[in-house]
Amino acid sequence: MSSNNPNRVYLDTETTGLHPEEGDEILSLTIVDANGRLLFDERFKPKHKKEWPEAQAVNHISPEDVEHLTTIDAYMEQICRILGRIADEIVGYNVAFDIGFLKAAGATINPDAIIIDTMQEFMDAFGNSNTGHRYQPLSMAAERLGYNWTSA
């Protein structure tokens, strides 16, 4: 996972749903650097959502798992320091989804950062004919690349 760019970060979120503009929120955020060093890894209590059954079926994060945690606001300064000032390359699978949620939560993203969407890279290399959809799940990409995928 190493990179020639020490300011490249990889990120992933888990959320209460698919639409931040409709009130869905971030449940967890993980950020690692180009050498695999963990920079940030936290779960959050949503500010407004009380349940998310469809998302829970996918991400396995229940309301009980996060009910005693703090909201993302408590970590926003740290998140903005990493994504707004340190990171000049941001990599993720369907990363526009993650960045949309982060911005909706109030995070500042370096406007000059290069955004690398590995889902788009996968679809460019392997096409999207398997499902006919724009979105290809990470599990499908892992399977196609021969990775022994087990869901969290």
Please report, for each region that a protein language model flagged, where it lies by residue.
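Conserved non-catalytic scaffold segment of RNase H-like nuclease domains
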Residues: S2-N110, G132-S151
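A short coil-to-beta-strand element that immediately follows conserved catalytic motifs
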Residues: P111-I115
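Short alpha-helix plus adjacent loop in nuclease-associated cores
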Residues: I116-Q136
